Design a protein with these regions (language model features):
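Periplasmic/extracellular loop-to-transmembrane helix junction in inner-membrane transport proteins
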Residues: 1-29
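Short cytosolic juxtamembrane segments of multi-pass membrane proteins
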Residues: 199-212
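Generic hydrophobic transmembrane alpha-helix motif, especially the helices
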Residues: 57-93, 100-101
Length: 212
């Protein structure tokens, strides 16, 4: 706790939290946008699903940290590389959950909407996404967890800012108390995000769908 106090006093802890969270938000936003788009295409177009469906499942099994070498080659030691690792670690969880959610929508529900004139982006935003919302929330929650691990892991390996960097500084200086203190902060942020964001969303979904 003393190390947390020192970090808070000199601002390094708050700066590290802000840096990591910014990278996380950007990477997760990219993953959510890309994952929803890809998942809907896979669910609505069988040729797309047959072409890349198995590939998406395979790519999801790759740990985020395994993308670090490619990130370094393509982006160098930069924020873009860390954001890439963050986004790629989360996008496939969002994709798979979106695909599952859209696939589980009653076809008659979609046909009724189309008969009423819904098509294109209107069909997606007004019909498909609301109907698949419970699955989307599950995908966002999984994606957040993967993204948070990805950003911290990438920062440990090639960053000069962020919570992962502070962890690495503790390792290099053999400062066990600093390492543990930063780990506590990382865990605390995870608990807060889960409780303040995803628990509330899940409760709303359960209430909306009559599950709670």
């Amino acid at each position: 706790m003393q190390d947390l106090g020192y970090g808070a006093a000199d601002g390094s802890l708050f700066y590290g939290i802000g840096t990591s969270m910014l990278r996380l938000i950007v990477g997760l936003a990219i993953a959510i946008a890309g994952g929803i788009t890809l998942g809907i295409f896979m669910a609505r177009m069988e040729t797309v699903n047959q072409t890349i469906g198995s590939l998406v499942l395979g790519l999801q099994s790759i740990p985020s940290i395994a993308w670090v070498p490619l990130a370094l080659i393509w982006f160098g030691v930069s924020d873009a590389g860390i954001i890439f690792v963050t986004a790629i670690g989360a996008i496939f969880a969002v994709t798979i959950n979106t695909y599952t959610g859209v696939k589980n929508i009653d076809p008659h529900y979609i046909e009724a909407a189309q008969n009423m004139g819904a098509k294109g982006s209107q069909l997606i935003t007004m019909v498909l996404m609301p109907a698949a919302f419970p699955y989307l929330i599950s995908g966002f929650k999984q994606g957040w967890a993967f993204a948070w691990r990805g950003v911290i892991g990438a920062e440990i390996l090639f960053s000069f800012l962020g919570l992962g960097f502070l962890l690495n500084v503790g390792r290099q200086t053999i400062d066990v108390s600093q390492v543990i203190a930063v780990m506590v902060v990382i865990m605390g942020i995870g608990i807060l995000v889960d409780g303040l964001v995803f628990k509330r969303l899940e409760n709303k979904v359960m209430s909306r769908w009559g599950l709670g």
